[in-house]
Amino acid sequence: MRFQNPISVPSLLELITQKIEVKGEVDFPITGINELHSVEKGDLSFVDHEKYYDRVLGSEATFILINKEYPVPEGKVLLICEDPLMAYLEVVNHYIKFTPQNQQIHPNAKIGKGTIIQPNVFIGEDVTVGENCIIHSNVAIYANTTIGDRVVIHSNSTIGADACYFQKRPGGWVKFDSCGTTVIEDDVEIGANCCIDKGVSGVTQIGEGTKFDNLVQIGHDTHIGKRCFIGAQVGIAGCTFIDDDCVIWAKAGINKDLYIAKNTTVLAFSGID
């Protein structure tokens, strides 16, 4: 997630209730907040498990919340605290707050010329729907979703719901609040009862000309390429990249963090891990 206005480290510390020890210095502000899979230079990220220390410290992230004393890599700032995840979530929740909506279509939503919105459709804040689309009854389009031209979404599908992303702790599951977005490109058709989760901090993207059957689940931060065909009851986990012109037949399951090459065909009931 990009910040509308970059912030300084002292301003960041005002958003976090924990004690933070700052190590390192750079000459530019914090420009966004992102999880490991989508970090860029200038981003704030976090790490709280030794399995990921090297990956996060070696990533593009410039500002890192961490729960361990560690040599400061060149060009980075370490923000040492007891609980990096909760510090990270405090920052997310400062920028992303749930606001109840009492209209079916948010006043600032943008609906293109020739688009048909059927009864009982919900469209959230900062949503853009392109021209000549058909959005069928009972579709829910969550905030911060962008839909291209000539897109068809069939009844009861949900676009841009929160990621299913939690950390197990002694007191129960802690949710990673989602601050990412969803992009549906031109000429996509989405069947009935499909669910496409928004990015945790990045983008979930469905490429131009791709077609979904019914009951498809797409996890957070996943990229589906152009002209793909996804059969009924396919489930694709988060942070996976499906390249262009792939065909995935019914009830296939694809795990997280994978790359599926162009023109791949996945047969029905397959499991890819």
Predicted regions span which residues?
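Structural signal for interior beta-strand "rungs" in well-ordered beta-sheet cores
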Residues: 46, 104-273
